[in-house]
């Protein structure tokens, strides 16, 4: 990627400030374009199923829906004993109860969100090993079923109930994902892969026996594992697969994600793994299937998920994964989340976009900014920019200064040079998230880091850090100079003026 470096040095008295290298980024409004579906905001993860009955969960859902307009939510444990789906009478006969299931899914649909039905975990009375408990705080059972016949019966009854309550036309838009990360300690079957494939086969066939329109898929593995084996197995056995799903995080090891010991930066790992899986799908003749990446997040070290780092990491992931995944599901939209127990206080590095109490994190504002990107992406080879166009002909441009975790970053200076567009009287609006804008963590610390913030404190924090109206910025000729601090994300909305004469 060619660029020109310009040196601007300032002399203040006898102090010479370091020169800041300025990188030129050419923004060509006539560049080749391609459809740009917002795959990063179609789906979010959340805390387990039963938490969705809490008003705090639903408040966070509505808040994130407002800024990202996501369509699907995925969570664990719809079959967990606390949901009460499966029991047995005194004679050992199955007894089903879908009362909480209805409340859970009713709540999602009422707020304009559909479920990704992750079929997990095992009801204790259906478990082959009732003591096979995962170490999560709520101790889900990860055992295979004691009887595949009874499992088939549960799946069939579950699907029939959903169709009776919500209608086939609605439920046909849902996704049914079989289990969660069966390649690690979420699945206790032996041998692990073979027993999971048996579970998948039975589940897919049972669901399809109720309606061929139900969409079922997997393998929902951690670290991009098993996809090639899964596709080979289901093809050979003629088992239905309507989508492929897997997981991967930016701080997963390169060996686990990619099967190599090469030095791959955290910036590049996730989309390299997504690309690997997409390649396996092509090799298996299944590239036509949707690829749902049903869990991902930025690195969790140093509480980065509470900081401005999320913005550049998210934007760069969008840039690299565009065209590879149909949905990239951020884990999670909210810190109403209890895998390690109730969260004690806000800002402890948890996954969500909203901290405990409904505090908007910088990541919340990052998603709000990137939601504004257009429906067409214009070709641009610079690794720190996404250029898009809206239907109203506005250009919407994301620019960022990514700093690799564990490194000290510096400010970066960019000169954006606009080509092939009328710029006389052009209007440019700028919003940004960085250390000074949208930084709720800093505001929270400035408030004394209250362990149990009051509603008024939460209101003040969100008001203090809200993005607000875009700032109007001016061009110098056909160019715009920007300076971005470490891990800054800037969004520009350019309304073209009349062509220059």
Tell what function each PLM region has:
Residues 81-85, 124-134, 184-187, 251-257, ...:
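Short acidic/His/Gly/Ser-rich catalytic and metal-binding motifs that mark active-site loops
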Residues 50-53, 185-190, 253-256, 301-305, ...:
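A generic structural signal for short coil/turn motifs at secondary-structure boundaries
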Residues 21-175, 194-223, 237-239, 282-288, ...:
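Non-catalytic accessory regions flanking glycosidase/transglycosidase catalytic cores in CAZymes
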Residues 1-5:
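N-terminal secretory signal peptides that target proteins for export/translocation
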Residues 79, 121-123, 180-184, 220-224, ...:
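Active-site-proximal loop/turn and secondary-structure-junction residues that shape catalytic pockets
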């Amino acid at each position: 990627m060619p660029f020109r470096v310009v040196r601007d040095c300032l002399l203040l008295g006898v102090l010479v400030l370091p020169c800041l290298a300025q990188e030129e980024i050419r923004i060509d409004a006539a560049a080749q374009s391609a459809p740009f579906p917002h795959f990063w905001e179609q789906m979010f993860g959340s805390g387990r199923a039963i938490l969705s009955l809490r008003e705090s969960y639903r408040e966070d859902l509505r808040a994130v829906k407002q800024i990202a307009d996501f369509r699907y939510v995925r969570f664990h444990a719809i079959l967990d004993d606390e949901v009460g789906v499966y029991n047995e009478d005194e004679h050992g006969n199955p007894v089903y109860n879908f009362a909480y299931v209805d409340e859970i899914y009713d709540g999602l649909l009422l707020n304009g969100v559909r479920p990704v039905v992750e079929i997990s975990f095992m009801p204790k009375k259906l478990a082959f090993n009732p003591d096979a408990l995962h170490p999560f705080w709520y101790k889900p059972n990860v055992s295979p079923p004691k009887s595949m016949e009874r499992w088939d019966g549960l799946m069939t009854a579950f699907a029939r109930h959903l169709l009776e309550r919500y209608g086939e036309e609605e439920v046909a838009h849902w996704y049914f994902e079989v289990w969660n990360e069966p390649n690690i300690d979420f699945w206790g079957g032996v041998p692990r892969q073979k027993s999971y494939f048996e579970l998948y086969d039975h589940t897919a066939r049972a669901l399809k026996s109720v309606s061929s329109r139900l969409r079922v898929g997997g393998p929902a593995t951690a670290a991009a594992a098993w996809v090639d084996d899964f596709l080979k197995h289901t093809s050979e056995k003629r088992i239905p697969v309507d989508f492929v799903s897997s997981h991967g995080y930016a701080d997963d090891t390169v060996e686990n994600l990619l099967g190599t010991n090469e030095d791959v930066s955290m910036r590049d790992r996730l989309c390299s793994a997504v690309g690997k899986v997409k390649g396996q799908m092509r090799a298996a003749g299944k590239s036509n299937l949707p690829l749902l990446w049903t869990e991902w997040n930025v690195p969790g070290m140093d509480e980065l998920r509470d900081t401005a780092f999320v913005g550049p990491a998210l934007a760069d992931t969008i840039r690299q994964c565009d065209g590879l995944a149909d949905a990239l599901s951020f884990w999670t939209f909210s810190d109403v989340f209890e895998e390690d127990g109730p969260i004690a206080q806000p800002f402890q590095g948890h996954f969500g976009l909203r901290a405990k109490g409904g505090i908007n994190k910088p990541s919340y504002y990052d998603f709000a900014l990137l939601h504004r990107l257009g429906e067409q992406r214009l070709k641009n080879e610079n690794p720190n920019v996404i250029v898009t166009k809206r239907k109203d002909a506005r250009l919407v441009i994301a620019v960022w200064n990514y700093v690799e975790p564990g490194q000290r970053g510096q400010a970066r200076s960019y000169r954006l040079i606009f080509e092939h567009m009328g710029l006389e009287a052009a209007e440019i609006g700028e919003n940004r998230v960085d250390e000074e804008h949208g930084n709720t963590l800093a505001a929270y610390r400035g408030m004394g880091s209250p362990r149990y913030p009051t509603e008024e404190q939460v209101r003040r924090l969100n008001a203090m850090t809200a993005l607000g109206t875009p700032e109007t910025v001016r061009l110098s000729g056909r160019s715009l100079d920007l300076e971005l601090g470490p891990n800054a994300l800037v969004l520009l909305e350019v309304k073209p003026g009349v062509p220059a004469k």
